[in-house]
């Protein structure tokens, strides 16, 4: 896929901002049902994008390099998160951090938002080798075989959730069908109607593991794509910039979301939490970009992610 799909960058912007918002403990505690709704679709959509954009038509050395530069930042940040969880009183606090516990979290059961990269690495590995061995199968046969392999990995090794893997598989199916992204995920203002009905009438189905979760993910993507053409050029540039740099936010946002806990007393006068949310999200995004710019200028990015620059500046 040579041409960048800007609609995907826009969707990534929307979902990464929602991720940051509801990783803010104050916001999540104040609006628990909204958090449940957002958790139904935001990372599910990222897995769909990852499956859709995955390119497995490459040699083993190039693929190994790709996996290496996914694993290195994952390992660094997950290691830091695990150590932090053993020190700070966070919800995922580890009471007794041992080497066995550390290795378990790093290789098998990651903590924090880094589970996404862990899942992605596993899915890429399985997808690559199935593609190398069975690429000539029909679309249906290939996707079924890949699904069986991913299901086997999830059930026998218990290192990924099959609920999450299914969204990656959906992205692969969409990509290999050779149909345009917006032909499958059609922009629609009407998508807000069934979405609202699900939220009001079926709160128990708000889980990414349910059929309703799949439908909700599709509806939110569809509605968001309907909004995209109406963005002003300035808003669009900002959104696409954020969308192209979601990896930086995923990697470094936990550092800054913890700091935002200290902001709560200053916004106690606002019962809606809107001001707290706006300031905190801007702080987290800005902090992530500052870290990345410093890494780029010091030459750390080359050793951290295999690229001279981790920060991507869109060329429109």
Which sequence ranges carry the predicted segments?
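Alpha-helical transmembrane segments and their immediate juxtamembrane cytosolic regions
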Residues: 1-316
